[in-house]
Amino acid sequence: MSHGHGAYVFDATGKKYLDFLGGIAVNALGHAHARIVKVIRREAARAIHLSNLYHHPFQGPLARKLAEWSGMDRVFFSNSGTEAIDGAMKLARLAGRTPATPLGRPAEKHRFLALENSFHGRTFGAISVTATEKYRLPFAPVVPGVEFVRFNDPADLEAKFDATVCAVLLETVQGEGGIHPVSEAFWDRARSLASEHGALLIADEIQCGLGRTGRYFAYQKFASKPDMVLIAKPLAAGLPLGAILTTEAVASQVSPGMHGTTFGGGPLACAVALEFLSIVEEERLLENIRARGEELREGLGRLASQFDFIREIRAEGLMIGIELSVEGGPFVAEAMERGLLINCTHDFTLRLLPPFVITRAEVREFLKLFETVLAKTPKPASASEAAKSAILPGAAHAAARG
C-alpha cells in the first residue's frame, strides 16, 4: 500500500481500496485526517520524546479526558495494548497481596480467570490469558495461575471463582474471537463475584473501546463499572499508545518504580490522542457510528437472506462479524481483488472495522461491493467439511494453519 485518504487506501499502482479493516481498528478517523496531520506536524517539530521524568503539556489533560469518558480515576500510559494487559496483570497481583505476604512469595489471591475464545495480545503475560491455543501453546509453560471460563456462562464462572482469584479479565466484545459481546448476565455476575471476593474486574477494550461500539466504552451499556479498563488501538490515531484506566483504590497501591514505560505517554502521541478525543466529541462521531452501524446491520441482514452460507451477523456499532458456514479466507481475497479490505478471524467469521467517519454513501458502496464478493467467490469447504478434513490422513497441513 502506498497511501490513504479518508476511508480509502491506494496501492503502489494507484488502485483504490475501500478500507473496512482500518489497520485492525486503529485508523478510527480513516487516513490522513487533516486535524491529525496538523498536530503531528506541529508537535514533531517541538518534542517527539522527553521521558516520563518530566511533565509535558499533553499527558495530564489526556489523562483527565480519559477519566471523564470512562468514570475511572487514574491513568497509566503504555506503548501498546499488550503492554497495558501485562501492566494490568501486575496491578491485579499487587492488589491481591496483603501486608502479611512476604515479598517473593505468592499471595493467596494470585489467580486470573479469563474467557475461552479470548485474545489479549502477544507479550508473555498477554498470551498467558489468551485462550486461543495457537497463540499460547508454542510458548508453554506460560504464566501460571490462569484458568479459562466458558464464554457467557455465569455458572461456570461461579464454579471456578474462589478466594485465590485476584482478577477476572475479559474483552467486553471479543474481537479476534469473532465479534462476540459479553452478555449482561455474565458481566453482572463477574462484577458481583469480584466485589464479593475482593478481586478485580478488568475490561479489555483495546479493540472495542473509545467509540467503536457507539459508546465511549462498550461496558457503558451495563449498569456497573470495571476496576480497570485497557485501551490502545485508535487512541493516538495510528501512533503507538496504550493506557490502563483504573480506580483510585487500585492505583493507590502502586508506589514509584513498581511499573514504568519508556515510550508510553510521550508528548507527540499524547498530543495526537487529545486531538482524536476532541474530534470524536466535536464531530459527533458516536452518532455517526450508531447510524452507519445500523445501516450496515440492516444491509447485511438483507444479504444474509440472499446467501444461505451466512449464518449470523453480530454487530456492535462499527464492530461487525459475519459468521459463515464456509471458510472465509477466499472471500477476503476476492474482496481485495475488487477493491475492498476486510479480514477473516477464526476461519469462518469475516470482520469489519470501518472508520468512525464513514458516510452513508460509503456504506452503500461497501454493500454493493460485498454483494458482488459473496456472489462471485467460489465456495470453499463448509465448517463441517473443514472439521472432517482435519482428522483425515494427509490433512495435517490444514490443521496446522490454525
Predicted regions and their residues:
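Conserved N-terminal phosphate-binding loop of PLP-dependent enzymes in the Aspartate aminotransferase
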Residues: M1-G402
